């Protein structure tokens, strides 16, 4: 009976790890058809941000130049304009299809992530007892470590996450999350998050050391500052 009770938190922890993947896969399959039909049946206006509008205009200009060059070389001047209009019309339809697919992709990923967050939040609330058991195990494990190992681990973690060499890693991670929600890549927003988010984390971490560790384990704080210096 005791072994069974000890196994339940491990099962709960494994379910938390694999549940987001399962929710994402299930929601993508179930919501894709509904979102696609809903998007295609509505007479929605086309909203483009500055990046999408600039990219679309560049594609049209490149397309027009390529068609003009190609048709002027191969055909007589009297016929190349007609083929130019036909070619641009076909490419315009392809651009519209690409835009619709991109919008559907954005809505699908955003809806899936929100739904996944809601389900995981409810799952965590329902599994509060298992989380308390896992938390007690983690605290017991950390308590058995020496202050030197704790200080080294804290220093290593902070250097990896909020050190001077971490911006590239933050850029990749924020870019991945930004893309996972289906948003168009925006260097300005990503750069702004990379330059501010680690600074906020660093401030919170230093405040945590000052308020919590100074009270719980002053020797750990002394060792941490000694290693850091």
From Swiss-Prot:
A GO CC term assigned to this protein in UniProt: chloroplast inner membrane
The reaction(s) this protein catalyses: K(+)(in) + H(+)(out) = K(+)(out) + H(+)(in)
Topology relative to the membrane: Multi-pass membrane protein
Cellular localization per UniProt: Plastid, Chloroplast inner membrane
Gene Ontology molecular-function annotations: antiporter activity; proton transmembrane transporter activity
Gene Ontology BP annotations: potassium ion transport
TM ranges: 6-26, 114-134, 189-209
Main location: plastid
Matches recorded under Pfam families: CemA
Keywords, alphabetical: Antiport, Chloroplast, Hydrogen ion transport, Ion transport, Membrane, Plastid, Plastid inner membrane, Potassium, Potassium transport, Transmembrane, Transmembrane helix, Transport
Transferase in keyword set: no
UniProt superkingdom: Eukaryota
Disulfide bonds: none
Similarity section: Belongs to the CemA family.
Purpose: Contributes to K(+)/H(+) antiport activity by supporting proton efflux to control proton extrusion and homeostasis in chloroplasts in a light-dependent manner to modulate photosynthesis. Prevents excessive induction of non-photochemical quenching (NPQ) under continuous-light conditions. Indirectly promotes efficient inorganic carbon uptake into chloroplasts.
The name this protein goes by in its record: Potassium/proton antiporter CemA
């Amino acid at each position: 009976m005791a072994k069974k009770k000890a196994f339940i938190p491990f099962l709960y922890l494994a379910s938390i790890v694999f549940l987001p993947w399962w929710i994402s896969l299930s929601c993508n399959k179930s919501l894709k058809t509904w979102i696609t039909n809903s998007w295609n049946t509505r007479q929605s206006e086309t909203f483009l941000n500055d990046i999408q509008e600039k990219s679309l205009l560049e594609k049209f200009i490149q397309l027009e130049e390529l068609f003009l060059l190609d048709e002027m070389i191969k055909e007589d001047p009297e016929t190349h304009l007609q083929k130019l209009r036909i070619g641009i019309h076909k490419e315009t339809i392809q651009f519209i299809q690409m835009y619709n697919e991109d919008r559907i992709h954005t809505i699908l990923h955003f809806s899936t992530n929100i739904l996944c967050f809601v389900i995981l939040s409810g799952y965590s609330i329902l599994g509060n007892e298992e989380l308390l058991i896992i938390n007690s195990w983690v605290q017991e494990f950390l308590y058995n470590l020496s202050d030197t190992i704790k200080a080294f681990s804290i220093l290593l973690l902070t250097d990896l996450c909020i050190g001077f060499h971490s911006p590239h890693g933050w850029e990749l991670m924020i870019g991945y999350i930004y893309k996972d929600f289906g948003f168009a890549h925006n260097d300005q927003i990503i750069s702004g998050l990379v330059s501010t988010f680690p600074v906020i984390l660093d401030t919170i971490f230093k405040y945590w050391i000052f308020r919590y560790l100074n009270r719980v384990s002053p020797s750990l704080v002394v060792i941490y500052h000694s290693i850091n210096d």
